[in-house]
């Protein structure tokens, strides 16, 4: 956990807390290999700050778990009917532990229920599911998509960059997550989301997810971002290449 300086045009620089997060986690409460306490131990030992539990169609009582210094978020993965007979995989983060809409009939019902409960909804691994960008855009109210998902790499569909790019070109300001979607040990620590929040409290983390104050990564990290007088500046850790991508570029 560290600080980063964010400065937008015509505004003062703001110091935010940077939190390393895995936002897609399965346990033995659905189809995961590890118990909640085992998963917490793995991520705490690896230096993560935030862990969201998102078991299939069921929530976890995260308030009863030993967080081992991390912030734990209550979540769920929902699977309502989708286009062409393909079930949606909707990642919900920040919902109450007693969330009741565990078997929604439609994708829109799922997203609406998540938002009404105070959570944030994302389309999980749409490329792996087989959805097009146009189909993803029928879900009104999602915050974004998983742009990288570790557990779908086995069939070469871990990256969802094309779908994300097409939705952005269509005018949807979707944000992007990188997640492990951990089911077992081979899925650990391959993609994560760096959340820039006012604090490590659940409320501030969820506000950051709603507002897009985060970035997806598999390694490189930002230290400073600035946009002033039409000039974008960034300081970050060493990487193989850095490309600034604009609209339709």
Where are these regions (language model features)?
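A metal-dependent hydrolase metal-coordination microenvironment
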Residues: 2-120, 124, 129-141, 146-166, ...
């Amino acid at each position: 956990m560290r600080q980063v300086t964010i400065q937008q045009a015509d505004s003062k620089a703001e110091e935010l807390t940077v939190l390393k997060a895995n936002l897609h986690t399965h346990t033995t409460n659905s189809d995961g290999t590890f118990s909640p306490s085992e998963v917490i131990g793995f991520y705490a030992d690896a230096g993560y700050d935030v862990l969201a539990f998102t078991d299939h169609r069921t929530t976890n009582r995260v308030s009863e778990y030993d967080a081992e210094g991390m912030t734990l978020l209550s979540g769920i993965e929902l699977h309502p009917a989708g286009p062409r007979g393909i079930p949606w995989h909707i990642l919900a983060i920040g919902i109450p532990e007693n969330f009741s809409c565990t078997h929604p009939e439609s994708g829109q019902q799922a997203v609406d229920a998540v938002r009404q409960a105070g959570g944030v909804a994302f389309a999980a691994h749409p490329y792996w599911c087989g959805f097009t960008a146009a189909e993803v855009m029928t879900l009104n109210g999602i915050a974004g998509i998983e742009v990288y998902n570790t557990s779908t790499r086995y069939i070469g569909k871990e990256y969802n960059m094309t779908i994300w790019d097409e939705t952005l070109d269509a005018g949807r300001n979707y944000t992007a997550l990188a997640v492990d979607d951990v089911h077992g040990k081979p899925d650990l620590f391959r993609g994560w989301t760096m959340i820039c929040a006012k604090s490590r409290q659940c409320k501030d983390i969820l506000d950051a997810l709603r507002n897009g104050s985060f970035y997806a990564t598999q390694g490189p990290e930002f230290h400073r971002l600035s946009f002033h007088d039409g000039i974008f500046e960034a300081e970050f850790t060493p990487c193989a290449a850095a490309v600034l991508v604009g609209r339709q570029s």
